[in-house]
Amino acid sequence: MDKKQTRLRRARKTRARIAELKMVRLSVHRTNSHIYAQIIDETGNKVLASASSLEADVRSAMANGGNVAAAAVIGKRIAEKAKAAGIEQVAFDRSGFKYHGRMKALADAAREHGLVF
């Protein structure tokens, strides 16, 4: 197995565990250039809130959407949008990525602004 397949296998296992818990999940995806976060309902069928470094106001404020600072901004935005939608507690789905760097920055910012996970 190569690196990507290993990451995707980890992601499937994590999502299966979250599905058993029947919890709303905070799903995060990253690329070299951008970071994306979505709040997905218990069934996995509906996106309740989303934020990404591609949004116009984030893009104008940040020169680079693929760094730790951008991840922290996205964490703050997703927490604000989730609270506006009435969501306080989520399960963190890091999509198989290591909890380090941008993932950690996004998670810490989301926790600071009120999300519980």
From Swiss-Prot:
Keywords: Ribonucleoprotein, Ribosomal protein, RNA-binding, rRNA-binding
Cellular component aspect of the GO annotation: cytosolic large ribosomal subunit
GO MF terms, alphabetically ordered: 5S rRNA binding; structural constituent of ribosome
Keyword Signal: no
Highest taxon listed in the record's lineage: Bacteria
Role: This is one of the proteins that bind and probably mediate the attachment of the 5S RNA into the large ribosomal subunit, where it forms part of the central protuberance.
Protein name (Swiss-Prot/TrEMBL): Large ribosomal subunit protein uL18
GO terms (BP aspect): translation
Source species: Chromobacterium violaceum (strain ATCC 12472 / DSM 30191 / JCM 1249 / CCUG 213 / NBRC 12614 / NCIMB 9131 / NCTC 9757 / MK)
Family the entry assigns: Belongs to the universal ribosomal protein uL18 family.
SUPFAM superfamilies xrefs: Translational machinery components
Gene: rplR
Subunit composition and interactions: Part of the 50S ribosomal subunit; part of the 5S rRNA/L5/L18/L25 subcomplex. Contacts the 5S and 23S rRNAs.
Entries under InterPro entries matching the protein: Ribosomal_uL18_bac-type, Ribosomal_uL18_bac/euk
Cited HAMAP family: Ribosomal_uL18_B
